[in-house]
């Protein structure tokens, strides 16, 4: 399966294929001339696949070094980025060379940020290995690192030269890590694809883990939602905000819990349920939709709430949300399954929203 992210200034393809990782050398050769490559990966993914990937790239004529960092959201910071910049410089990476992000969402965000800022920007590729990264963060060009104040506070919009998705690598994920990625899949269904919602209704996490043909289809449909929105609004000023359904409260939960304690897809699930509950009470979403969303997230092993629910800490995190404009936060609601809408909320109203 192939999708084309047809951006006027930087079009690229997303390849989705079981077993695609075994052909990585040919894929990279089709996009880049023989050059130096820095493979950026965390210790877990690098331990599983790194040596084979490097061997294939070297066999195809590339000179490769690997920058490895400790697994987890806590590594997505300026210190790790600086270490990566220095690593690239010591290897002699120039603007005609490239970086490959090989790992989950943390790796993709970090490596993309490093590539977009090293020497004011060099080429990079995305090879996502988590479900969250495959269906969401690897497409669209958002890169970033966290600060103490907020998730992804420092970042750029920089598109990759290509994305290679191999669903088979998901077999090495634990059940929590796999289900976490389904938070973003459910979000895609809610904002833009009712047929995907119906498919998720008919399946279960067990079905998906046992049938990778179904996983390939679900990844494709989710990526198509992301592709359409990105092509229409590359810089996140309009319809691309729809992709943030559940993220306003979700990012606040991640921040207050401490990065990594609540996984991103889990936080999105919590955020979708909580914002829907508020919007339903205010008549902005239809009666009963919150229960439908809650039922779906719980069916796929995701949380619908977070404790302790500290309104003051959550509100403080929300004030640093990237969707804030002055004292207004642009939240996303779902008027019906398969559609989305922007709802502007003041900070004061948001305080009320957070009260239980």
From Swiss-Prot:
Ribonucleoprotein recorded as keyword: no
GO biological process per UniProt: amino acid biosynthetic process; aromatic amino acid family biosynthetic process; chorismate biosynthetic process
Keyword Transmembrane set for record: no
Metabolic or biological pathway, per its Swiss-Prot or TrEMBL entry: Metabolic intermediate biosynthesis; chorismate biosynthesis; chorismate from D-erythrose 4-phosphate and phosphoenolpyruvate: step 2/7
Residues annotated to bind Zn(2+): 184, 247, 264
Keywords tagged on the record: Amino-acid biosynthesis, Aromatic amino acid biosynthesis, Cobalt, Cytoplasm, Lyase, Metal-binding, NAD, Nucleotide-binding, Zinc
Cofactor: Co(2+); Zn(2+); NAD(+)
Name of the protein described by the UniProt record: 3-dehydroquinate synthase
Organism (species): Lactococcus lactis subsp. cremoris (strain SK11)
Gene name of the record: aroB
